[in-house]
Amino acid sequence: MPATKFSRRTLLTAGSALAVLPFLRALPVQAREPRETVDIKDYPADDGIASFKQAFADGQTVVVPPGWVCENINAAITIPAGKTLRVQGAVRGNGRGRFILQDGCQVVGEQGGSLHNVTLDVRGSDCVIKGVAMSGFGPVAQIFIGGKEPQVMRNLIIDDITVTHANYAILRQGFHNQMDGARITHSRFSDLQGDAIEWNVAIHDRDILISDHVIERINCTNGKINWGIGIGLAGSTYDNSYPEDQAVKNFVVANITGSDCRQLVHVENGKHFVIRNVKAKNITPGFSKNAGIDNATIAIYGCDNFVIDNIDMTNSAGMLIGYGVVKGKYLSIPQNFKLNAIRLDNRQVAYKLRGIQISSGNTPSFVAITNVRMTRATLELHNQPQHLFLRNINVMQTSAIGPALKMHFDLRKDVRGQFMARQDTLLSLANVHAINENGQSSVDIDRINHQTVNVEAVNFSLPKRGG
């Protein structure tokens, strides 16, 4: 048998064949790259946690198909950055389970897709939660936004969700990190023990929109304190100098329809915000009786530079705009705000409810109250801002309850008198009418000591200045 001859051509041919081998070995790896969509029902049903983790490793989008129920989701599942969970069936747990959303993650509900006792835990930027129905009293919150990492999260979208029979719906704990840009819109909240939306100690956040929501039947019966509010936003410690770094700020709450709760909108230590287009009914003390919260459609505590506009209330407690108080100590007073287009009709209520109760002060400061119409309710003004304007005010309160208009400016002998403006003070009243059920003037004004007083078209007399 002739000996094998190795020519240059033979070596080149062999070398070419060897060069191809790495690419041949790589082909199976390429075949395992994530697919665009995977179906969770193609994975073992007896271990949902492991199945979801593998599904997210295999696909860009994981689908829970219609009619399919994923049970026992009782631990944390991290959705890899940029991936999507599409829920058309149901995902259920015992309250300990959660999906952690990283940068660019989406959870989308379709065809009635739902989560029960499973939390969505937002930990990244550009996250979207949309269209999903959520319920269950297992977790404290259905959607949690926070964590303890000092990071900046941007551009959160929560839209068209339904949360019912739960504790909190959306809970933001903001002390450790920042949310720059959030849109929480077009959603429905009902039958909750806690708040529909709570934005707590969110002192670093900005550009927050909360709008177009329906909130119904929030009633805390579990003994928890400060639970049971529709929408609540809070800064940190009250401070009458209103430093930016301690306030929740730069937000809008708009187009809210609410009923059957103790308090609908609540802000503590806030500034630079707008609340507008709120329609409320049956905001009464019959709800959340032991939660320790005031009864009011809108409650504002220790806030600066805000606008409340176009509020329509029926058979409800109205507004409380009051001091920032901690353990009985008065730390701040509201300043620099405008109320406009406020309507309250309590003719069908058989008992006394708050009308509009305002405490305001400081120098410099202003308060403008315009276009108010209230029936069977009282407008109460306490303490003394530097400049106070009332325009187009019509209030009626029955004599058995009290006056329709109260103006108590004189707090010189009260600890709260520390907030009274005393220099360059102005009181301006135009087209202000306060009557009882018989159309008679109904006012209680303690003292006028403003340096400038302008009065036009009012149905009552002011007391003599000074004293």
From Swiss-Prot:
<dbReference type="InterPro" id="IPR006311">
    <property type="entry name" value="TAT_signal"/>
</dbReference>
<dbReference type="InterPro" id="IPR011050">
    <property type="entry name" value="Pectin_lyase_fold/virulence"/>
</dbReference>
<keyword id="KW-0448">Lipopolysaccharide biosynthesis</keyword>
<protein>
    <recommendedName>
        <fullName>Colanic acid biosynthesis protein WcaM</fullName>
    </recommendedName>
</protein>
<comment type="pathway">
    <text>Slime biogenesis; slime polysaccharide biosynthesis.</text>
</comment>
<dbReference type="GO" id="GO:0009103">
    <property type="term" value="P:lipopolysaccharide biosynthetic process"/>
</dbReference>
<dbReference type="GO" id="GO:0045228">
    <property type="term" value="P:slime layer polysaccharide biosynthetic process"/>
</dbReference>
<dbReference type="InterPro" id="IPR023882">
    <property type="entry name" value="Colanic_acid_synth_WcaM"/>
</dbReference>
<dbReference type="InterPro" id="IPR012334">
    <property type="entry name" value="Pectin_lyas_fold"/>
</dbReference>
